[in-house]
Regions:
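Basic/charged alpha-beta structural segments of nucleotide/phosphate-handling enzymes
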Residues: 9-173, 188
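Conserved RecA-like ASCE P-loop NTPase motor core of nucleic-acid helicases/translocases
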Residues: 2-14, 179, 183
Length: 190
């Protein structure tokens, strides 16, 4: 009963509901940690990959990518004619740049989860067959250049490192009780 229990859930609301159900059934619910899959994966990376241990959060999370992308898009006006035209439109340019950077950061976050091979392939820049996505590959390459000490610490790269580590190392994981609850579908990296 005193062993820490980690529950991987699809939403914080579901986590709260589970804690209430456990408390109702057992009279108390303590030492229960409900986490989203991405949070669990970051903790897994930190437990197995030494380079991630000093980082509280990923340098590639959407909020950080928003600000980095904003700076890099602004510094590279030749990145995409479409972006240049959009930013030249009416209204507050800085607001438009921020909102665009935020959308791109969220898109990259989804790519890291659902299209990891794209991101791994893009580290060297765009390829001929990418067409309209070539500016995205170029922006990703600029982000990677801007983070030379962390380029191997994005979700797609970390996932490969963890799988390799789990195949070759017998290190015990820090969880004694781990449950997955209410996840009907999961992307490849989860």
């Amino acid at each position: 009963p005193f062993i820490p229990r980690t529950l991987i859930v699809q939403s914080f609301g579901l986590g709260q509901w589970l804690k209430l159900q456990l408390a109702q059934r057992h009279g108390i619910a303590t030492n229960v940690d409900c986490v989203l899959p991405a949070t669990f994966l970051w903790r897994l990376y930190q437990s197995l990959i030494p380079d991630t241990r000093q980082l509280a959060e990923s340098p590639f999370d959407a909020e950080r990518l928003t600000w980095r992308g904003m700076r890099l898009i602004d510094a590279n006006p030749s990145l995409s004619g479409t972006i240049t035209d959009y930013l030249a439109g009416s209204g507050d340019r800085d607001l438009r740049l921020f909102q665009l950077s935020q959308e791109i950061a969220l898109l990259f976050d989804e790519y890291l989860m659902y299209r990891p091979q794209w991101m791994l392939d893009w580290k060297d820049g765009p390829s001929e067959e990418q067409g309209h996505a070539s500016w995205q590959a170029e922006l990703w390459r600029l982000i990677m250049e801007d983070l030379p000490d962390y380029r191997h610490l994005h979700r797609a790269a970390l996932h490969g490192q963890v799988l390799q580590h789990l195949e070759t190392d017998t290190t015990e994981l820090p969880w004694q009780q781990l449950s997955v609850f209410g996840l009907s579908t999961m992307p490849p990296l989860q």
